[in-house]
């Protein structure tokens, strides 16, 4: 029981520990559980090629293939937001290429709508749009559909 509690404490303290490192780029990714190790290795390589020394903190629901693939700046660098779009795009494409998703447990919402249009099959987008409309057309994210007509939130307003 003590070991279980200690492991949970480590998991629960991850976000706070990372906040102490400064700015963060957060990614909510899912891939089939059997591909998680491959995803993490490839994603680390992508991130290190784009920003040598970046501090990578993958954690989360690893048993079901969901991972918070969060990044903190290299030591001595305060802001690295200029690479946010490039890193996000590359990680999203990697996850999709592995039959995964760039929008795991936190969903698509307004922040990821453009990526959904870019990476999701048109038939899938159509089904998702019809399903959303039939379930909550007037409740949540009114007007948000998979058609690029809704402007994504600026990065500063996400998360």
What positions do the PLM features span?
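Residues in flexible loops and secondary-structure boundaries
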Residues: 15, 37-39, 64-66, 70, ...
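Short amphipathic alpha-helical interaction segments
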Residues: 79, 83, 87, 108, ...
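Alpha-helix capping/hinge segments and adjacent helical runs
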Residues: 96-108, 133-141
């Amino acid at each position: 029981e003590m070991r279980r509690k200690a492991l949970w404490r480590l998991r629960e303290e991850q976000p706070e520990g990372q906040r102490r490192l400064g700015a963060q780029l957060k990614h909510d990714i899912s891939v089939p559980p059997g591909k998680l190790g491959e995803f993490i290795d490839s994603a680390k390589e992508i991130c290190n090629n784009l920003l040598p020394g970046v501090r990578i903190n993958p954690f989360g629901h690893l048993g079901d293939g969901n991972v918070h693939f969060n990044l903190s700046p290299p030591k001595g660098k305060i802001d690295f937001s200029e690479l946010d779009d490039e890193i996000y795009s590359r990680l999203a494409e990697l996850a999709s290429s592995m039959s995964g998703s760039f929008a795991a447990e936190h969903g698509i919402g307004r922040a990821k709508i453009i990526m959904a249009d870019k990476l999701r099959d048109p038939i899938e987008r159509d089904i998702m749009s019809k399903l959303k409309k039939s379930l909550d057309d007037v409740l949540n994210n009114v007007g948000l559909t998979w058609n690029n007509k809704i402007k994504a939130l600026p990065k500063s307003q996400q998360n």
